Design a protein with these regions (language model features):
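Conserved oxyanion/phosphate-binding beta-strand-loop segments in alpha/beta enzyme cores
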Residues: 88-91, 100
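Short hydrophobic-aromatic micro-motifs
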Residues: 91-93, 207
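Primarily the internal scaffold of c-type cytochrome electron-transfer domains
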Residues: 6-75, 81-86, 103, 107-119, ...
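C-terminal substrate/ligand-recognition segments
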Residues: 128-143
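Short acidic-aromatic active-site loops that bind/stabilize oxyanions
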Residues: 122-130, 201
Length: 229
């Protein structure tokens, strides 16, 4: 996309959409992983590094303290969360996040003590990235949940919210744009499934609300059937 839409790409680069999710690295992790500790409800969590990898020592699914590797960052501001891989293709969101405005660790549940067997515990389904969060932080997300085994084989085209997340599949548009302008055929919306200019209020809702709203997902997103209202 950047080859033709350089200014749009420049504005997107390092935006909230670009930083919606990323691989944990020196440049993407904002939290203090230099031995910082945070205590809540009697549980002390420690954040540290080993070589170029990031870890947290905290309460696990059995109620015992364990070591967990942080593989991905989630979001950028005003807070950044961290995702930990679990068996079955699952990614789980830690309940402690980094406050990027005050440069401190804080809990997302300050007034609640959540037991390890609770649905809301960070290792359980309530904090499962695949089912609860993934669709709106990556592009062309396919959960690939297997109900028989209870496992995920989740895939994406782009790890973050990239061009096709809002504009829809772009291959037809790219093929059209690659032809000499004088030889291009006349096609609807320059080959894109989603109309994204000169929108009325309802069209804006249909385009943005699938993610910027409190709702529940019942199937993988389909740009050709995106109407909410």
């Amino acid at each position: 996309c950047a080859e033709c839409h350089a200014e749009a790409y420049r504005q997107w680069l390092d935006s909230d959409h670009d930083n919606a999710m990323d691989v944990a690295s020196d440049t993407t992790v904002l939290g203090d992983f230099d031995g910082a500790e945070f205590t809540h409800a009697g549980v002390t969590s420690r954040f540290y590094r080993r070589d170029d990898r990031f870890f947290v020592s905290t309460e696990g699914p059995d109620g015992q303290t364990g070591e967990f590797e942080v593989r991905y960052t989630f979001g950028i501001e005003p807070l950044q969360q961290y995702l930990v891989p679990f068996p079955g293709g699952r990614l789980q969101a830690l309940p402690i996040a980094w406050d990027t405005e005050r440069d401190r660790w804080f809990t997302l549940n300050p007034d609640t003590v959540i037991a390890p067997d609770d649905w809301l515990h960070w290792t359980r389904n309530g904090q499962n990235w695949n089912g609860m969060c993934a669709e709106c932080h990556s592009t062309n997300l396919q959960k690939n949940f297997d109900p028989d085994t209870g496992t995920y084989a989740t895939r994406w085209s782009e790890i973050d919210v990239s061009c096709e997340a809002c504009h829809g599949p772009g291959s037809r548009h790219v093929a059209w744009a690659s032809v000499d302008p004088d030889a291009r055929e006349s096609i609807d919306n320059v080959g894109l499934e989603v109309v994204s200019s000169d929108l009325d209020n309802r069209q804006y809702v249909d385009l943005c609300a699938p993610c910027h709203a409190r709702r529940s997902e019942i199937a993988d997103y389909d740009h050709s059937q995106s109407g909410l209202m």
